[in-house]
Amino acid sequence: MSLTTHDRYAIRDLYARYSWARSTADIDSFAALFTQEAVIEDEGHRFDGPGAATDYLRAWLSRPGAAGQQYWIMQQVLDGDSTGCEARSFLMTPMLNPIGTPSMTFYRFGHLSDRLVKREGTWLLSEHRIDQWRGEVLEGFPRRDIAMVSAGGTP
C-alpha cells in the first residue's frame, strides 16, 4: 500500500520536529526521531548504531557558530509504502552573522537522502545522509562549473 495522506503528514511533522530539535540543541527530542540502529552520514562523517543521533548532534553542536544556526528542511519527495519510505529534501542552514549585526548568512545549501521506517505507528529515521548541493545532484547539467566552484569543489 502506498503512503497515505496521514503518513505524509506524519513524515513532514517528523522533519519539523527534527529542524526544531536540531536548531534548539534539544538532544533528547532529536534522538527520539531515529531508530536505535540508525546510520547518519554528514559529508564524510559517519555515526551508526545505538547513540548515533545523540553522538552526531553533540558533535555538530560543538562546531563554532552552531548556536546561531537554524536548520531548514523543505520540499520532500517521498517514495514508499505504509511501512517504509525514501525521502529526498532540500536543505538550507542560515546562521546569524558572526559580526553581531541583525543579519544572516547561509552556512549550507544542500540536500538530504533519507530512509524512514514506521515502527509501532511512528515514523523514524533509519538512514540520514546530508550532502552539499554538488556532485551527483548536478550531473544532469551540461555546465556545472559555476555551481561546483561556488560550493567549494572543482568543476
Annotate each language-model stretch with its function.
Residues E136-P155:
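Acidic/histidine-enriched, glycine/proline-rich intrinsically disordered or flexible terminal extensions
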Residues M1-Q36:
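Short, low-complexity N-terminal intrinsically disordered segments enriched in polar/charged residues
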Residues Y71-I73, Y107-L112:
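Short, surface-exposed coil-to-beta transition loops
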Residues P94-T105, E136-V137:
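Short, cysteine-centered beta-strand-loop-beta hairpins and adjacent loop/turn segments enriched
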Residues T5-Y9, A66, S103:
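Short helix-capping and inter-helix turn/linker motifs at the boundaries of alpha-helical repeat units
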Residues I27-T93:
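A solvent-exposed, acidic/Ser-Thr-rich amphipathic alpha-helical stretch
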